[in-house]
Amino acid sequence: MAGRATATATAAGKDRSSFAVTCSLLSQFLKEKKGGGGGLQGLGLGLRPAPAAPPAAGAGGAFRPPPTTMNLLSGLDAPAVEVEPNTADTAADELPLIKAPADQQSDESASEAAGEKAQQLTIFYGGKVVVFENFPSTKVKDLLQIVSTGDGVDKNTGTAATQSLPRPAHNSLPDLPIARRNSLHRFLEKRKGRMNANAPYQANCTAAPSKQANGDKSWLGFGQEMTIKQEI
């Protein structure tokens, strides 16, 4: 029993001595690598560096993070990006044209023909208005060509139409004072009738002053009679 105890004690002393030796060697190695590697990081153990100490607080006690810089001109160094043309336009141009079926084309032509027929034509000629319903546009063109060339137009009807047209306004101006003349003649006739009705009274009035004038001169006759009587 005593031998086993001494054996275990000697083994423990050896282990402690070997552990102390390894610790001393490690500390010596770290001191040597302190200047270049920086402690345990140079051993390749995957240890992260210790965080940097925070800067000292300002006078107010508020923490101020270190300033950061941003490179705003980094896009100038990047190569230019080539923009591809719009593929939708090219695809639309490359698509083949789809034609409508024959039945649909015939229906469209029929509808167009019906639209041409459902038109109204109004003609002003010879002071009259003539209206044609459902007159096709193709015949309108033919009619305009005929009118422009003068074919199919009777000269007698043209002259009759021009003769039947009303006179212009400047020719009818002298006819306007006729009513005034008639009213003036009526007024003069009425005035003449009044003068004829008042004519006897005017004659008596003119005779009365002559009588008064003769009466005023009658004393001259009395003087002549007195001289004649004295002579007798």
Swiss-Prot record:
Residues in domain Tify? 114-149
Region (Disordered) spans which residues? 54-73, 151-176
- Signal peptide range: none
Q: Which InterPro entries match?
A: CCT_CS, TIFY/JAZ, Tify_dom
Disulfide cysteine pairs (residue numbers): none
Compartments, as annotated in UniProt: Nucleus; Cytoplasm, Cytosol
Kindly provide the PTM information from the record: Ubiquitinated. Increase in jasmonoyl isoleucine (JA-Ile) levels mediates its degradation via COI1B-mediated proteasome pathway.
The record places the motif (Nuclear localization signal) at 179-186
Q: Which UniProt keywords apply?
A: Cytoplasm, Jasmonic acid signaling pathway, Nucleus, Plant defense, Transcription, Transcription regulation, Ubl conjugation
The record's section on Pfam families has: Jas_motif (PF09425), tify (PF06200)
Q: Which GO terms describe its cellular component?
A: cytosol; nucleus
- Motif (Jas) positions are 177-202
Asked if the record carries the keyword GTP-binding, the reply is no
Q: How does it assemble?
A: Interacts with BHLH148. Interacts with COI1B in a coronatine-dependent manner. Coronatine is an analog of jasmonoyl isoleucine (JA-Ile). Interacts with TIFY5/JAZ2, TIFY6B/JAZ4, TIFY9/JAZ5, TIFY11A, TIFY11D/JAZ12 and TIFY11G/JAZ15.
Q: Which family does it belong to?
A: Belongs to the TIFY/JAZ family.
Q: What is known of its domains?
A: The jas domain (177-202) is required for interaction with COI1.
**Functional summary from the UniProt entry:** Repressor of jasmonate (JA) responses. Acts as a repressor of JA-induced resistance to the bacterial blight pathogen Xanthomonas oryzae pv. oryzae (Xoo). Regulates JA-induced accumulation of linalool at the transcriptional level of linalool synthase gene LIS. Linalool is important for resistance to bacterial blight pathogen Xoo.
What this protein is called in its record is Protein TIFY 10c
Q: State the encoding gene.
A: TIFY10C
